A protein has these predicted regions:
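Conserved acidic, metal-coordinating active-site core of Asp-based
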Residues: 6-9
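Active-site core segments that coordinate phosphate-bearing ligands/cofactors
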Residues: 1-3, 13, 17-190, 194-295
Length: 295
């Protein structure tokens, strides 16, 4: 493989394999008991899908954190797509409109989301392309930038926030459609973005997919714990462990009228993506090339 001798590569083992125990030095540093079994574990997507119980039962999984990714059932080995900016976009707009009080960070989000919820779907004709840190999918583009389209004097921070939530949902839909080879009936939603009831509903309405919300939203950590439990024999298999441990606390259905409305907007979102894409890297580059006048 790319010139690396096979003997230099590690032996491939199941993620739940016990590979040793906590050393004395590690026990002193962490407070863990010396000899506690250590399992291999897995990467973030593997552990998150397991902690969301979306691996062996045909469900898709959507993780929303600073960025977002989704994995779907597929005849291919691994169908996965990611976007660079999702939770970060909400954090950014909260800061831009002056609601990011460091002493109470949660209050700013709550206030802005409450205001956005009072805005009807469509954000007053405002579309948002959420490429604030380049883009990973469906088409990777390091030069991609964010866009508000349709901005008028009639728009305020509530409309801006609603457009951000909807724009991220539209983009996630485009990724799902790009990697799916069969209809998706339900999807488990995890990560910090799943805390917002408004965002959960917008995603369901935009995608037309039933969302399942588990009790533990930090599914990656739970998945790692499940692997440890399987490794030491507490559970007979990963799937049986996930079936027992993961508890779904909400099933959120898409609302038919709103889904139909978003279906009308979605083609305009895709059209805007296509029209703006050739400009990525051009206008900002020109602005950097020219010597800026003094302020």
């Amino acid at each position: 493989l790319v010139g690396v001798p096979v003997e230099k590569l590690p032996v491939i083992k199941p993620s739940s394999t016990v590979v040793g125990g906590v050393t004395r030095e590690a026990a002193l540093a962490t407070g863990l008991r010396e000899g506690t079994p250590v399992v291999i574990g897995g990467g973030d997507t593997k552990c998150t899908r397991l902690g969301a119980n979306s691996e062996g039962n045909g469900r898709a999984c959507l993780y929303i954190g600073t960025a977002a990714w989704t994995a779907v059932p597929s005849r291919r080995r691994h169908a996965f797509g990611a976007t660079a900016t999702t939770g970060a976009a909400l954090k950014w707009i909260t800061s831009v409109v002056g609601l990011n009080d460091p002493s109470s960070p949660g209050e700013g989000y709550a206030q802005l989301l409450a205001e956005a919820e009072r805005v009807p779907p469509g954000a007053g004709g405002l579309l948002f392309l959420p490429h604030l840190m380049g883009e990973r999918g469906p088409q990777p583009n390091a030069k991609a930038t964010g866009t508000f389209f349709g901005l008028t004097l009639g728009h305020g921070r509530a409309e801006l926030a609603r457009a951000v939530l909807e724009g991220c949902a539209f983009h996630l839909r485009s990724i799902l459609e790009n990697i799916s080879d069969a209809p998706i009936e339900e999807m488990t939603l995890v990560g910090g973005g799943a805390k917002s009831a408004l965002w959960r509903q917008i995603i369901a309405d935009v995608t037309g997919i039933r969302l399942l919300v588990p009790r533990v939203l930090e599914a990656g950590a739970l998945g790692a714990a499940i692997l440890a439990g399987v490794g030491v024999g507490i559970y007979p298999s990963e799937q049986e462990a996930a079936d027992r441990v993961v508890k779904i606390v909400e099933r959120r259905e898409p609302e038919a009228e709103r889904h139909a409305f978003y279906n009308q907007i979605y083609p305009y979102y895709l059209d805007l993506e296509g029209r703006v894409a050739p400009l990525y890297g051009e206008i900002p580059l020109k602005m950097r090339e020219e010597e800026a006048p003094c302020a």
